[in-house]
């Protein structure tokens, strides 16, 4: 009886390396696949692709599996990076990891793996897949401190049916222990913390290579000009550092935060104080919707939601929203408690306990506390 073939996405990191070893120990026919998603010539000294490939080969030799490299740089630029630039140009703050998972790691990579006669694919993500009544559910990882279901919420039934997450039941500390015990050459390698195409370079320097600067006024909610910004694309909601403002002599000395963008007038709005009403949203509207089960929750469904990675689930009620210009689905969330710095372009991801339901891209939010009159504006909505 032939072994079931599983193609493992190997990055050169500890998580994917331990994933490959675990599956090999469980008797699978494991093949490693290294994805090159960014051309070295585009990234110079900041990209670690060469060293990552060396680490993948070293690990594959140690655990006794075949490994190959595949270049998805063209697909990445077309499906992920181009959208990344479009969103920043529109004043929003995208999350390319979400799109990369949906379009590259679980689409282009999955298709390539199937061409290698694989039955399944596996990655080192911290999440879980559960089959129940013929349907597949995406669950949070056992180690909630490392849970990555937020980045995986756009996966569909076809993708989940072919996916394994061996680390979903294992604490990160145990993964490090396994790597050391079996002598992986990359056992002490640090976890990657940035987007590959940005690397360790200052983010503003990177973005400036692709987007033009367009200076404009920096104003307070009452219209007072307090400075000049270098371009709306270079700021994000809730940002404190890099604004160029100290404590206001006429104010209370509290730190300044980016609170809003007016695309039409090229104005950046800033406020003083972490809990300023302009930084607190009680409702949001999201588009570009994707549901793991293929259909949305019921109107009024009480759920939890994250509007950024590592955020605790915030209690809210799900609702339908006015469709987009082309009739595309949207949804709304009404939170029990106001949420801080809800950012257009980021993902709003819904949960029913441990189950990730799916989500969408935040388009706008209603700011201010209940009972207060919030400024009549949409947060960086430029659609």
UniProtKB/Swiss-Prot annotation:
The record marks 125, 346 as: Interaction with tRNA. It is found in: Cytoplasm. One of its GO terms (biological process) is tRNA wobble position uridine thiolation. It catalyses: S-sulfanyl-L-cysteinyl-[protein] + uridine(34) in tRNA + AH2 + ATP = 2-thiouridine(34) in tRNA + L-cysteinyl-[protein] + A + AMP + diphosphate + H(+). Keywords: ATP-binding, Cytoplasm, Disulfide bond, Nucleotide-binding, RNA-binding, Transferase, tRNA processing, tRNA-binding. One of its GO terms (molecular function) is tRNA binding. The active site is at residues 100, 196. Residues 146-148, 308-309 are annotated as: Interaction with tRNA. Disulfide bonds join 100-196. ATP binds at residues 9-16, 35, 124. Its EC number is 2.8.1.13. Transmembrane segments: none annotated. Residues 95-97 are annotated as: Interaction with target base in tRNA. One of its GO terms (cellular component) is cytoplasm. HAMAP family: tRNA_thiouridyl_MnmA (MF_00144). Catalyzes the 2-thiolation of uridine at the wobble position (U34) of tRNA, leading to the formation of s(2)U34. Belongs to the MnmA/TRMU family. This is tRNA-specific 2-thiouridylase MnmA. The lineage of its organism: Bacteria, Pseudomonadati, Pseudomonadota, Betaproteobacteria, Burkholderiales.
